[in-house]
Amino acid sequence: MNLSIFVIVPLLMLLGLWLARNDKQVRGVMVAGASVLLGLSIYLVFAFLEARETMPADQAPMLFTYCVPWFEPLHINYSLGVDGISVVMILLTSIIVFTGTFASWQMEPMKKEYFLWFTLLSIGVYGFFISIDMFTMFMFYEVALIPMYLLIGVWGSGAKEYSAMKLTLMLMGGSALLIIGILGIYFYSGAQTFEILDIAHHTNGAHAIPESVQNVFFPLLFIGFGILGALFPFHTWSPDGHASAPTAVSMLHAGVLMKLGGYGCFRIAMFLLPAATHGFWIKVFLVLTTISIVYGALSACVQTDLKYINAYSSVSHCGMVLFALCMMTETAAAGAILQMLSHGLMTALFFAVIGMIYHQAGTRDVRYLGGLMKIIPFLSVGYAVAGLANLGLPGFSGFVAEMTIFVGAFQNADMFHRVCTIIACTSIVVTAVYILRCVGKILYQKVPSSKLEKLHDATWDERIAVAGLIACVAGLGMFPLWAEEIIRDAVGPIFSVIM
């Protein structure tokens, strides 16, 4: 399978959108393109599983590799490939692009321009996950960031210009750290290439990058990617950005874009600078991620805006991804990838339902919402399912991911790590506080105004989006083994290098 198809199809969608003359044609292009991408992602999963059976059990295959020299003086290649981690992230991206298209169709003005930038954002995300050349990854990373300013600043709500600028400046600051770290690895590895696997192979032994050098570039890369993963104290852009973003952008941003942070930390920072993961910096980041988990959950408790509640919840759950990576156990790392997949699905469901309620009610304030289960039962069930998954209720995706993380975390017998794990576990109780408060208040308490009684339940477009995400959240919770197996196949050999 040629992985370039995941870039080519969105490019064709851009062309189709550019030529579209009315909203009907825009809808046709988006539905067709998103459906093709989802179908290709499902096919990729099955093709990967089939190809994986022919590989040795102790190897993490980078399958469907493709390399074309791009800028030879600097040895930059257009290099593509996927392992189990990439495959599940590509599937997650396609699910959210597909459901996001349906979820936001009734809401957004200037649909042609909106979906042009939305599709460009998806190109950056797809390209990042299929790239195995650091420079190509960075290029697609930047492509994913650029549309965010316009999507929030033009189509957002509230303090949208402030939120868009704050998000852009913070993430561009992270990009500056990333390019320094990437160039540092390129020059000090001696491999004369940006390709991740070639660098890892070259530096595994006598040509290892000196530990003192690794300790310089590791924090730059971890913080650079960690900013996108809402690492404390660099998380402040995230709640404002989520709250102001339009529905589909919130879904893709929280569901997928933030996962680029954890993916980059594991794939580049930890994999290529393994000596630095055993020193001072990993303990610093363990403390910061523990703070992220607890601080995000506590902050969600004091919010009244549904989007801010979910945004701070995302800070907590994405902090759990980085926390698991810092635990330095294979089980916890596998849990981190599962958490990326699980959180992506359930937070997309949250933002989809919240956006649909806000579109009609004109408010996201918990204090002015109530009795929605009687008025809009379908959307209310969607919100309840997202809340239960967020709680980690057995049978939903959140339970599988969080249990894997905490079991893996307790495998580290060091007292410092045990204390951090116990503190992080308190977030489970705090999460129950704000989730149950919201579910009880907005779904079952008295309807506060006659305006809410005029709300209508989801349209067919919205039902497709919500039902699809509910099925994915429940499906991953009930049948997690397929994802867990291909993730462990990829995590194991990477950890053999790190440890």
Task: Give the predicted meaning of each segment.
Residues 142:
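Short phosphate-coordinating micro-motif centered on Lys-Gly-acidic
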Residues 1-2, 17-102, 106-116, 192-193, ...:
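Transmembrane helix-loop-helix hairpins at membrane boundaries of multipass inner-membrane proteins
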Residues 376-378, 435-499:
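Cytoplasmic/organellar membrane-interface segments at the starts of transmembrane helices
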Residues 99-105, 123-135, 149-441:
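Hydrophobic transmembrane alpha-helices and their helix-loop junctions in integral membrane proteins
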Residues 4-19, 31-46, 90-104, 121-123, ...:
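Central hydrophobic cores of alpha-helical transmembrane segments in multi-pass inner-membrane proteins
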Residues 32-50, 171-183, 379, 383-391, ...:
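Hydrophobic alpha-helical membrane-insertion segments
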